[in-house]
Amino acid sequence: MTSTGKDGGAQHAQYVGPYRLEKTLGKGQTGLVKLGVHCVTCQKVAIKIVNREKLSESVLMKVEREIAILKLIEHPHVLKLHDVYENKKYLYLVLEHVSGGELFDYLVKKGRLTPKEARKFFRQIISALDFCHSHSICHRDLKPENLLLDEKNNIRIADFGMASLQVGDSLLETSCGSPHYACPEVIRGEKYDGRKADVWSCGVILFALLVGALPFDDDNLRQLLEKVKRGVFHMPHFIPPDCQSLLRGMIEVDAARRLTLEHIQKHIWYIGGKNEPEPEQPIPRKVQIRSLPSLEDIDPDVLDSMHSLGCFRDRNKLLQDLLSEEENQEKMIYFLLLDRKERYPSQEDEDLPPRNEIDPPRKRVDSPMLNRHGKRRPERKSMEVLSVTDGGSPVPARRAIEMAQHGQRSRSISGASSGLSTSPLSSPRVTPHPSPRGSPLPTPKGTPVHTPKESPAGTPNPTPPSSPSVGGVPWRARLNSIKNSFLGSPRFHRRKLQVPTPEEMSNLTPESSPELAKKSWFGNFISLEKEEQIFVVIKDKPLSSIKADIVHAFLSIPSLSHSVISQTSFRAEYKATGGPAVFQKPVKFQVDITYTEGGEAQKENGIYSVTFTLLSGPSRRFKRVVETIQAQLLSTHDPPAAQHLSDTTNCMEMMTGRLSKCGSPLSNFFDVIKQLFSDEKNGQAAQAPSTPAKRSAHGPLGDSAAAGPGPGGDAEYPTGKDTAKMGPPTARREQP
């Protein structure tokens, strides 16, 4: 698999299945996007490469959620997912390739669009969004950077990394999206309807198409968030009156009064234009929802995809709903995914180029279990199969193969191969440790344990020596434990350290030498931390002001994400960036607001106690984060600069005038604001950042705020670029 370059030297060509990797198309938070060319048909695709080793489990779960959501959506204006490949280190998403670039760059080049062209783009966006909402999917990160154009200048909605399934009348909690396009309820940290949040974002996009500027803009992040919450913006006179009423209905602070997609599609400006073609609509598909008699009739691949969506985390409840006789949301989503699987079966590639790689990417293929009618399909001669545990829980195909290979390697070392088959299908069933089914990287708590089963004669099958047995010889168990700490599990060569159970600890160290257990090197990494709390007392402030200050403090700290638990409780997570991975353990803590003193009449301005409780993570880093939040809570005037909380000094880039275009939109806002606050504190005049080369200062979308790696965890902001100053100052005047 080599090709000769001009200098006569051999250059290795990289392949993902039948696709040859070529130039890099872009770079995001989760990895690179490269151009792929099919070795036979020359079809071009975009291959998103996700490095599993460099991303946290929560981010990888979001990648799996994006895969499941893209399987649910088939629309001409939504980017298509073709296939998924994977090996031990990388995950490869084979996506539709569109050559027109981003709508953002199109706006930078052309300036504000004519109402006719803006209506064409807007109709396509609304058509695709309406299809997503009809399948209970909310995008939550709509902006021109995530809207791509094909060769005919038609819209493709991309980047569903922040998308969520909103079932029924439930509300969402995660604060995500870009500040210029986020609705007020998201900015305030309240629970919100994802569908209404998408409508607000579409209103901001339509304004940008028609004006070439954003309705809410400010160099100061705090001022920007305040403008969004007020919802007051300047409406240029050149916007048609009908369109002005549509914009005011979409960019409405009160979510209850905000227009719905149904009202938008009936609006006179949306319908207008007699000679304009209607947006292309997908062929409606009627999926029959039928009853599922038993667990054996449930397709394991579809079950995996549903669990990856994130809203069906309770596996037992999901199975109960699927087996119910009544029609419900779970069954509708199940049969939609099953219908997609039957129409686009994922099978092994037939013609692959010759490869000499040690661990080539393998295609995710359908398990040979059930078809849509509950009957077993004939098995393919493929190693990519699905193993099922005793409890009925499916194990991913790659995991099952490597478990079997690990068992073979162990037997070849010990010579105990008489009672075990070498086939991954006929080997003893494997009981994996519980892990989120939606995660592509389930973290094992140890080497997989092959559960011995009684043979018909009554003699148990031998247990592979690689599996530490509680009843085994202590020194052998200790030796195996040391060996596994170097080798890792069959799938992962670097395991996360887990707190061992007392039973495991007793096997790690012989009983005759308790001193070794006390001085074990595990103690340097595993600490059973006691609950640590920090209290902050606040006087003469109403509860609403305290909550707003806490949310603003969260938003002003890079790499900190939060979610709302109740009216007076938040949960936050801070992830340090840079430095060795061993020092990047996230800090998780809870914030509770309690009323401590004063009568009911004084409750509005009484004494409140804000309690910060450390849930997990380093205590010192927790205290530094709380100190930063505390300084902002107790400040009555200008907020202090957000401190640099990382343990390394190379994480923060000061204003250089060359702000990167990729990464999270908020993180570089934070970097700039930190410098601005610092300058103000020292009595200096704060200077705005320089204009990036790509955003011409003379164009209607001249300046832009940079994007960097976004905060992680549940309240993570997505990868992408953000717009800061879209348009000349005259177009950004705010109404008094």
UniProtKB/Swiss-Prot annotation:
Positions of the UBA domain: 297-339
InterPro entries: BRSK1_2-like_UBA, Kinase-like_dom_sf, Prot_kinase_dom, Protein_kinase_ATP_BS, Ser/Thr_kinase_AS
A Pfam family matched in the record: Pkinase
Known EC number: 2.7.11.1, 2.7.11.26
Compositional bias segments (type: Basic and acidic residues): 345-366
Cofactor: Mg(2+)
Chief location of this protein within or outside the cell: cytoplasm
Residue stretches of biased makeup (Pro residues): 431-445
Known regulation of activity: Activated by phosphorylation on Thr-174 by STK11/LKB1.
Limits of the Protein kinase domain: 19-270
Sequence segments annotated as region (Disordered): 345-475, 493-513, 681-736
Gene3D superfamilies reported for this sequence: Transferase(Phosphotransferase) domain 1
Impact reported for T174E: Constitutively activated
Composition bias, Low complexity: 410-428, 699-708
Effect on the protein of changing T174A: Prevents phosphorylation and activation by STK11/LKB1 complex
The protein's assembly and partners: Interacts with FZR1, a regulatory subunit of the APC ubiquitin ligase complex. Interacts with COPS5. Interacts with PAK1.
Record remark on domains: The KEN box motif is required for interaction with FZR1/CDH1 and essential for APC(CDH1)-mediated ubiquitination.
Protein name: Serine/threonine-protein kinase BRSK2
Organism: Homo sapiens
